[in-house]
Amino acid sequence: AKIIPFSGFLMPVQYQGVNAEHLHVRKSVGLFDVSHMGEFFVMGKKSIDLLQHICSNDISKITNGKAQYSCLINENGGIIDDLIIYKFNENKFMLVVNAGNIEKDWNWIKLNNEKFGNKLENKSDNMSLLALQGPNSYDLLQELVDFDVRSLKNYSFLKKDINEFKDVIISTTGYTGSGGFELYCKNKYVSGIWEILFEFGKKFNLKPIGLAARDTLRLEMG
């Protein structure tokens, strides 16, 4: 793999080559390590009030177990970052932000929360994220979980075990436009989940994919 520094992480930009990786995700299945992304938790009775105040989309439209794409905005309505908001319940949300903006986003959310008094947790250094993407991702993940993965609608999520790895957030989100899942887990589980996915992924021709192909895939998706 070709490794480059990015937002304090050493990240794989490509493995066998961007074109080959791009096409492989479109027709089969690929695995991305995107653990550099930031994860914040908002917990409290005024979680929705805070998020309505700082995000551009309507938080009241999200039901439990669903996710919403949105923007974090400043006091003038200008965009600070884009993010995905996951709703566990009325009083608990997870915000997933871009790696290069973690500190800036966190400080802005903290500042705006002062009048709402919710509990905030920055779990960016404690959580890892793998993106399993492509048409074969469904059959591959099905081998490792105890629920029907195709029953999980787009932009939905569950907290489930993947084999012996506990409480993984399995989300039908991703940037590739080829379908698939994002898997949020504790740092101590990520290497084991990576390995078991490749063990079970042999028959599905699973390949590791770099960040360059992630960008070309999402650009092509539009």
Regions found by a protein language model. Give the residues of each.
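Basic, glycine/lysine-rich polyanion-binding surfaces/domains
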Residues: 1-222
